[in-house]
Amino acid sequence: MAAEACVPAEFSKDEKNGSILSAFCSDIPDITSSTESPADSFLKVELELNLKLSNLVFQDPVQYVYNPLVYAWAPHENYVQTYCKSKKEVLFLGMNPGPFGMAQTGVPFGEVNHVRDWLQIEGPVSKPEVEHPKRRIRGFECPQSEVSGARFWSLFKSLCGQPETFFKHCFVHNHCPLIFMNHSGKNLTPTDLPKAQRDTLLEICDEALCQAVRVLGVKLVIGVGRFSEQRARKALMAEGIDVTVKGIMHPSPRNPQANKGWEGIVRGQLLELGVLSLLTG
């Protein structure tokens, strides 16, 4: 069975290949305009990315594909409009959403409690067109806590106190917005995809990343985990974009090192990168 990058269930199959998303996309100003806000320009990049991703079809082992930039667009747009009102010096870059984080809330590393209670972001969340019975989308009613997201935002809450302090200079984004699962509901990362499908997907996401970096005026991309760091470096170098790319340890509990004091390790990494002063000032 092939899995498609889905649009919301309320969109008909005839509309799936772009008419609805094209109309939605046209509501956001041209990213080349000098008059719109960084948030509007950033959202335009993401809507154009959605349009390209909606045409992809994935083969085994992928059986289910979720795109929270479609069914959780409302809280995602709220996140961008709230915290992307100005250009950003630093972009923290994740790989792709987790099933109990951004998949539920539309916010990168979006563990429900931190998104709702610290970031103060909420919004209606619908459903993917096809849901795995073990990976239901419950939005802000999701009872599971994503460990990676909880660790990530807890660190910056501790460092910054208020989200406005963090977002004064920084923003958080994922390289790929799609979530992949096999027949059992096991999470698959982009690296688990067959090479041809993976290469096509990542090239599309690379292009969108380069556009986002330009739109935000980013000077430093910090990959959260090795994949994000390496992918960002490759994409930006290929486009001749002169931006520094560094990395920090991923907070995933599947990373044994992250279970041995991730917060302390990453505080040290941020200090070495010269970013800590941006987060505490």
From Swiss-Prot:
Annotated family: Belongs to the uracil-DNA glycosylase (UDG) superfamily. SMUG1 family.
Domain of life of the source: Eukaryota
Main location: nucleus
Function recorded in the entry: Recognizes base lesions in the genome and initiates base excision DNA repair. Acts as a monofunctional DNA glycosylase specific for uracil (U) residues in DNA with a preference for single-stranded DNA substrates. Does not exhibit any enzymatic activity towards G/T mismatches.
Biological processes annotated in GO: base-excision repair
EC number assigned by the record: 3.2.2.-
Entry annotated with the keyword Nuclease: no
GO cellular component, one term: nucleus
Subcellular location as annotated: Nucleus
Keyword Oxidoreductase included in the entry's annotation: no
GO MF: DNA binding; oxidized pyrimidine nucleobase lesion DNA N-glycosylase activity; single-strand selective uracil DNA N-glycosylase activity; uracil DNA N-glycosylase activity
Gene that produces this protein: smug1
Protein name stated in the entry: Single-strand selective monofunctional uracil DNA glycosylase
Annotated source species: Xenopus laevis (African clawed frog)
Key words, A-Z: DNA damage, DNA repair, DNA-binding, Hydrolase, Nucleus
Residues engaged in binding substrate: M95, F109, N174, H250
Pfam families hit by this protein: UDG (PF03167)
